[in-house]
Curated annotation (Swiss-Prot):
Function in brief: One of the primary rRNA binding proteins, it binds specifically to the 5'-end of 16S ribosomal RNA.
Keywords: Ribonucleoprotein, Ribosomal protein, RNA-binding, rRNA-binding
The UniProt record lists the keyword Methyltransferase: no
PANTHER family: 40S RIBOSOMAL PROTEIN S11 FAMILY MEMBER (PTHR10744), SMALL RIBOSOMAL SUBUNIT PROTEIN US17M (PTHR10744:SF1)
Signal peptide (from-to): none
Stretches that traverse the bilayer: none
SUPFAM superfamilies recorded: Nucleic acid-binding proteins
InterPro entries per the UniProt record, alphabetical: NA-bd_OB-fold, Ribosomal_uS17, Ribosomal_uS17_bact/chlr
Keyword Ribonucleoprotein applies: yes
Family (UniProt): Belongs to the universal ribosomal protein uS17 family.
Protein name per its UniProtKB record: Small ribosomal subunit protein uS17
GO biological process: translation
Domain of life: Bacteria
Length: 86
């Protein structure tokens, strides 16, 4: 079974070897037929402390690293949001 991969924005990199990634999903409300946005924060393992706040990153499922960390950063996938908007 393939591992799930999610794309999100780093909201915190203050912990050692850990980042917090905000992943946003969209769905159509079943009654109102309106597109609704929901977000969730995931703790992910960042072995080299490479990701910085504001970067768009990909994370994938992995073995549990701790109580909260069951995702890891996909290496070489971080890109700065500010650089892409300019």
């Amino acid at each position: 079974m393939p591992k799930r991969v999610l794309q999100g924005v780093v909201v915190s990199d203050k912990q050692d070897k850990t980042i917090v990634v905000k992943v946003e999903r969209r769905f159509t409300h079943p009654v109102m037929k309106k597109t609704v946005r929901r977000s969730k924060n995931y703790h992910a393992h960042d072995e080299n402390n490479a990701a910085k706040v504001g970067q768009t990153v990909f994370i994938e499922e992995s073995r549990p690293f701790s109580k909260l960390k069951t995702w890891r950063l996909v290496e070489g996938e971080a890109r700065d949001v500010a650089a892409t908007e300019a």
